[in-house]
Amino acid sequence: MARKSLIQREKKRQKLEQKFHLIRRSLKKEISQIPSLSEKWEIHGKLQSLPRNSAPTRLHRRCFLTGRPRGNYRDFGLSGHILREMVNTCLLPGATRSSW
């Protein structure tokens, strides 16, 4: 289980990213449309004045139950060992173990 502080930090980053998503997207769109270099620098300064944790690259996918940062399956939002336990105990409907 990950430390609770790390899980809370990740939740805080998700909230910030959602809050500034539209602003960040509009500023990036303006940069691509304006031909003047001096205006691009001004808009770039506005973009850099946004909080660092509001950037989508700062987010890290974590396991929904344990908060584990590695070995996650996107479809389920779970880490590998938790996914395996849940499939073995039939807690995930429709998931079957492969056999050949």
From Swiss-Prot:
<dbReference type="InterPro" id="IPR018271">
    <property type="entry name" value="Ribosomal_uS14_CS"/>
</dbReference>
<keyword id="KW-0934">Plastid</keyword>
<dbReference type="GO" id="GO:0019843">
    <property type="term" value="F:rRNA binding"/>
</dbReference>
<comment type="subunit">
    <text>Part of the 30S ribosomal subunit.</text>
</comment>
<dbReference type="InterPro" id="IPR023036">
    <property type="entry name" value="Ribosomal_uS14_bac/plastid"/>
</dbReference>
<protein>
    <recommendedName>
        <fullName>Small ribosomal subunit protein uS14c</fullName>
    </recommendedName>
</protein>
<keyword id="KW-0150">Chloroplast</keyword>
<keyword id="KW-0687">Ribonucleoprotein</keyword>
<dbReference type="GO" id="GO:0009507">
    <property type="term" value="C:chloroplast"/>
</dbReference>
<dbReference type="InterPro" id="IPR001209">
    <property type="entry name" value="Ribosomal_uS14"/>
</dbReference>
<comment type="similarity">
    <text>Belongs to the universal ribosomal protein uS14 family.</text>
</comment>
<dbReference type="GO" id="GO:0015935">
    <property type="term" value="C:small ribosomal subunit"/>
</dbReference>
<dbReference type="Pfam" id="PF00253">
    <property type="entry name" value="Ribosomal_S14"/>
</dbReference>
<comment type="function">
    <text>Binds 16S rRNA, required for the assembly of 30S particles.</text>
</comment>
<keyword id="KW-0694">RNA-binding</keyword>
<keyword id="KW-0689">Ribosomal protein</keyword>
<dbReference type="GO" id="GO:0003735">
    <property type="term" value="F:structural constituent of ribosome"/>
</dbReference>
<dbReference type="GO" id="GO:0006412">
    <property type="term" value="P:translation"/>
</dbReference>
<keyword id="KW-0699">rRNA-binding</keyword>
